[in-house]
Regions:
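Bacterial N-terminal signal peptides that target proteins for export
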Residues: 1-7
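Intrinsically disordered, low-complexity proline/glycine-rich segments
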Residues: 19-243
Length: 243
């Protein structure tokens, strides 16, 4: 595992030495790049901003007052984030993210989302949109991807009526094809197979969201993009598929 990480880092370092790395985005995505502010630096009082989107101060670990059924199911998770995501047209969503689940909770995760894949590594959460908006859940399995595409990274956001697919982005501009197999550099969001957003987790981060979407959908995509930007490095988590 460490050897694979070293190769990936050396490859990325070589690319960065030449120019700032950029994701290979689907050309059908109609959205401008929004550079992220606040990702690097102290975690105390951390606020994430990009474009018209911002959060309040990010909270790590649960405080009191969380009675969302999704959250109550997974109290043993080691990594927990919560924040308010503010979006266009004064839209606000309350967001709770969980990862590093206890082994005893993995089956609960699969049952909750109806997932048949036997991955051990999940990043999941709940998004509650204020002022009569919908309640959304999201899950991403194997969020780091893996070396040479040994295991996929994919997931979805859903509210009971609508589902937004999440797919990994592996390529960087200027990379030879073999290097595009190395690791995940971000994720894209799809509705009915059309790309409507993306997030780059390289360096400070960048987000793209199609402005033609309604305010709630844009804010929900932003909430998951922010969660992915905040998610700590999980290379130490066992990402092996159960046999």
């Amino acid at each position: 595992m460490h050897f694979k990480i070293v190769i990936s880092l050396l490859a990325l370092t070589g690319l960065v030495a030449c120019h700032t790395p950029e994701l290979v985005l689907d050309p059908s995505l109609s959205a401008g790049a929004m550079p992220v502010k606040g990702r690097n630096g102290l975690q105390i009082g951390q606020v994430i901003r990009y474009g018209d989107y911002t959060t309040d101060k990010v909270r790590r670990g649960w405080t009191k007052g969380y009675d969302i059924p999704f959250i109550l199911r997974f109290q043993g998770a080691k990594e927990k984030l919560s924040f308010a995501q503010f979006g266009p047209e004064n839209t606000k969503a309350t967001v709770a993210c969980i990862s590093k689940f206890k082994s005893t909770e993995i089956e609960l995760v699969r049952d909750f989302f109806g997932i048949q894949l036997d991955y051990q590594n999940y990043f999941a959460g709940n998004i509650t949109v204020d002022q009569g908006g919908a309640n959304w859940d999201f899950i991403l399995h194997n969020p780091n991807g893996d070396f040479l595409r040994e295991k996929a990274s994919a997931g979805f956001i859903r509210n009971g009526e609508q589902q937004i697919a999440i797919e990994a982005i592996r390529g960087l501009k200027g990379q030879p094809d073999w290097m595009k197999e190395l690791t995940v550099y971000g994720h894209e969001f799809r509705i009915d197979n059309a790309v409507v957003g993306a997030v780059s987790t390289i360096n400070k981060g960048t987000v793209w969201i199609d402005e033609r979407l309604d305010a709630e959908t844009r804010t929900v995509i932003a909430a998951v993009a922010t969660g992915l930007l905040l998610r700590r490095d999980m290379e130490d988590v066992d990402m092996q598929v159960t046999r």
